[in-house]
Amino acid sequence: MAHAGRTGYDNREIVMKYIHYKLSQRGYEWDAGDVGAAPPGAAPAPGIFSSQPGHTPHPAASRDPVARTSPLQTPAAPGAAAGPALSPVPPVVHLTLRQAGDDFSRRYRRDFAEMSSQLHLTPFTARGRFATVVEELFRDGVNWGRIVAFFEFGGVMCVESVNREMSPLVDNIALWMTEYLNRHLHTWIQDNGGWDAFVELYGPSMRPLFDFSWLSLKTLLSLALVGACITLGAYLGHK
């Protein structure tokens, strides 16, 4: 596989296609809009929802009152001018990430089922829940397993948003995921061989990806999603 060099691939495209895949698994179709390359720091373009028979998600965010009143819209990073052209994402990267996400979901099927039932999303709580989980997920460092968990958690939030007839939140979640990748994970990914290295390590052989303790993550998810009134630090300090 040709390596993308230091510039890397377009994180926005990776996020958009992953979310599209997770929603399609539940029978939803999401037009991710313009997935052309965007440099780290740039915000993704909003997507547009359509639905397969039997599902009635909201129309595009610009036409929905939830989107108009939501405080969650985040502008592009200041100074996010056009940077070096990013390389197109090879299909094998998307495929490997999907396979890893599905494997993660299967391993923790019960936890994700409980999480979905407890995910009390509103336009005013979604970003806080996302930020709390992601901050704790990477508190002790970054590895590929945690990056996959990051994508899968974002996918769960998107599916639950549509299930609760708040589909405009999907555009926001995609934006938050892309921004976090660009600002906090992009350097680690590039320093560790980029997405090509992820494919080489976990693609055909599917080397075990989830070889660290998930207790703190699962505890965190439970706390964040039921809106516990204690801080994570205080809780984890007594464990």
Swiss-Prot record:
Q: What stretch of residues is annotated with the motif BH2?
A: 187-202
Q: Where is this site: Cleavage?
A: D34, V35
Q: Name one GO molecular function term.
A: channel activity
| Residue window of motif BH1 | 136-155
Give any Gene Ontology cellular component.
cytoplasm
Single GO biological process annotation from the record: actin filament organization
The family database entries (Pfam families) matched by this protein are listed as:
Bcl-2, BH4
Could you list this entry's UniProt keywords, alphabetically sorted: Apoptosis, Autophagy, Chromosomal rearrangement, Cytoplasm, Disease variant, Endoplasmic reticulum, Membrane, Mitochondrion, Mitochondrion outer membrane, Nucleus, Phosphoprotein, Proto-oncogene, Transmembrane, Transmembrane helix, Ubl conjugation
Subunit info here reads: Forms homodimers, and heterodimers with BAX, BAD, BAK and Bcl-X(L). Heterodimerization with BAX requires intact BH1 and BH2 motifs, and is necessary for anti-apoptotic activity. Part of a complex composed of SEPTIN4 isoform ARTS, XIAP and BCL2, within the complex interacts (via BH3 domain) with SEPTIN4 isoform ARTS and XIAP, SEPTIN4 isoform ARTS acts as a scaffold protein and stabilizes the complex. Component of the complex, at least composed of LRPPRC, BECN1 and BCL2; the interactions prevent BECN1 from forming an autophagy-inducing complex with PIK3C3. Interacts with EI24.
Task: List, alphabetically, the PANTHER family matched.
Answer: APOPTOSIS REGULATOR BCL-2, BCL-2 RELATED
The entry's protein name is Apoptosis regulator Bcl-2
Source organism per UniProt: Homo sapiens
